[in-house]
C-alpha cells in the first residue's frame, strides 16, 4: 500500500516510521574509509580506494596509496596545459577517475606513509590556500607582459608544489624493499591499462568513444558510450565478481541525504491526481520539499528512469560532474527495493560509518561515468564496445 504525502508516494513502511532497513546482498572486500576533508579531491580519494580494492580482489595485500602524490602531479600537468591554452581550460582541483590511472602510468605511485603530501601544517587536506595560490600563479604567468614565457616558470610551479605537498622521493623503502615510484606501481598485482571508463548519453553514438563534455575532464579523456541498461549490467557484473566500481555521479539531487546516508529519486505524483495536496506541495520552498523527502522514514516509490531522462538531466545541467565514490556492493531495503552500497570519502561517520546506500534508480539517473576492469565486462557487451 502507499499514501500520498505532499506529492510524494510513500510506502506503508514509511508511514509507520520504521526507517530504512538495508540488507547487504553482495559486498566486495573494502579498504578503510578515507577523508578528503576540505578539498575537492573526491576523484582521487575514491579512485585510489577503488584501485586498492582491486589489489585486494587480485589477491594482493591491503595498502593505502598516497592521494597527494596523485593530486600534486595532476596539478602540475593541469598547469602546463592551462598555460599552453592561454587559460582556456578549467583550472581547479576537480578531476576524474582517469586522472589517477594516467598519473600512475606517468609518474608511478607511492604508499601514503612515504608521501603524505601534508606539508603545510595540517594532518588532513585543506586546499583553500593551495587552490588560490596555484590559480594565481598560472594566471600571472599567462598575463605576463614580456611577450614570451620565461625559462623559470616551470621551476617556480614545482617550487610551489614542493612547498605545499613535499619534495618527491626518487627512491624509498617499503616493507624492507627498495622501490622507485615507477617500480612500486609495477609491483602491484593490477595494471592501469586494464581500466576503462564508460558513460551513457545519446548526443554521441553508442558503441563509440567520445570526450565527455564536463569541466573537470581537463585531460579530454575519451570514454566508451553504451546504453544505460548495459552500463548497469556492467556494474552488476563487477560486484558479482567481487570487484568494485569507481563511480562519477551528482549528489546535488534532492533525494540525497547526507545525514541519513541514503539517496533516492522519489516519484512525485502529478498535480491533477492529488487535489489540494498538490496545491500545498507547489507552495513549498525547495528547502521545505527537501525536508519532507528527508523525513520520509522508509521505502518510497521511485521514478522509472529512462535513457531520455538521463540525457535531459545532463543537457540541462541537472546532472554534472559533482562527486566521485566507489560502488562496493548490492543491497535491498525492507520492501525489497534494490540499492547499491557505496563507499564515500567524507570520513567514517554517519549511520553506516562512511558508507551510503543509493537506490538503483538514483544510479541509473545520476551516473556520469564509471571506471571498471575491462576484463569483467560481459562478453556480449565487450564485443559491441570493440574491446
What is each stretch, according to the model?
Residues 155-387:
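Active-site signature of cysteine proteases
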Residues 17-246, 350-352:
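Active-site nucleophile-adjacent alpha helix/oxyanion-hole segment immediately C-terminal to the catalytic cysteine
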Residues 16, 72, 295-299:
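Compositionally biased, low-hydrophobicity segments enriched in charged and small polar residues
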Residues 1-17:
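Bacterial Sec-dependent N-terminal signal peptides
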Amino acid at each position: 500500500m502507499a499514501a500520498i504525502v505532499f506529492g510524494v508516494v510513500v510506502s506503508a513502511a514509511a508511514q509507520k516510521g520504521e526507517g530504512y532497513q538495508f540488507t547487504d546482498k553482495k559486498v566486495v572486500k573494502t579498504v578503510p574509509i578515507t577523508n578528503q576533508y576540505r578539498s575537492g579531491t573526491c576523484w582521487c580519494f575514491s579512485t585510489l580506494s577503488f584501485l586498492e580494492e582491486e589489489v585486494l580482489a587480485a589477491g594482493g595485500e591491503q595498502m593505502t596509496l598516497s592521494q597527494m602524490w596523485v593530486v600534486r602531479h595532476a596539478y602540475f600537468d593541469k598547469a602546463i596545459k592551462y598555460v599552453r591554452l592561454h587559460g582556456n581550460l578549467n583550472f581547479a582541483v576537480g578531476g576524474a577517475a582517469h586522472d589517477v590511472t594516467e598519473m600512475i602510468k606517468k609518474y608511478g605511485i607511492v604508499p601514503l606513509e612515504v608521501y603524505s603530501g601534508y606539508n603545510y601544517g595540517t594532518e588532513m587536506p585543506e586546499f583553500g590556500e593551495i587552490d588560490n595560490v596555484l590559480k594565481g600563479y598560472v594566471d600571472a604567468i599567462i598575463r605576463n607582459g614580456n611577450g614570451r614565457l620565461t625559462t623559470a616558470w616551470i621551476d617556480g610551479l614545482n617550487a610551489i608544489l614542493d612547498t605545499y605537498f613535499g619534495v618527491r622521493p626518487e627512491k624509498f623503502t617499503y616493507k624492507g624493499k627498495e622501490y622507485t615510484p615507477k617500480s612500486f606501481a609495477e609491483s602491484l598485482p593490477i595494471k592501469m591499462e586494464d581500466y576503462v571508463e564508460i558513460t551513457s548519453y545519446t548526443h554521441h553514438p553508442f558503441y563509440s568513444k567520445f570526450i565527455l563534455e564536463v569541466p573537470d575532464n581537463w585531460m579530454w579523456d575519451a570514454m566508451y558510450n553504451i546504453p544505460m541498461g548495459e552500463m548497469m549490467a556492467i556494474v552488476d557484473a563487477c560486484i558479482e565478481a567481487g570487484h568494485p566500481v569507481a563511480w562519477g555521479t551528482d549528489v546535488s539531487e534532492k533525494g540525497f541525504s547526507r545525514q541519513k546516508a541514503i539517496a533516492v529519486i522519489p516519484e512525485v505524483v502529478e498535480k491533477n491526481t492529488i487535489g489540494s495536496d498538490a496545491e500545498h506541495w507547489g507552495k513549498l520552498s525547495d528547502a521545505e520539499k527537501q525536508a519532507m523527502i528527508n523525513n520520509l522514514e522508509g521505502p518510497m516509490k521511485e521514478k522509472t528512469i529512462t535513457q531520455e531522462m538521463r540525457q535531459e538531466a545532463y543537457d540541462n545541467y541537472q546532472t554534472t560532474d559533482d562527486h566521485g565514490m566507489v560502488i562496493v556492493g548490492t543491497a535491498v531495503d525492507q520492501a525489497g527495493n534494490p540499492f547499491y552500497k557505496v563507499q564515500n570519502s567524507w570520513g567514517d561517520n554517519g549511520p553506516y560509518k562512511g558508507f551510503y546506500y543509493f537506490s538503483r534508480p538514483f544510479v541509473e539517473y545520476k551516473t556520469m561515468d564509471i571506471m571498471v576492469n575491462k576484463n569483467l565486462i560481459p562478453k556480449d557487451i565487450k564485443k559491441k564496445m570493440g574491446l
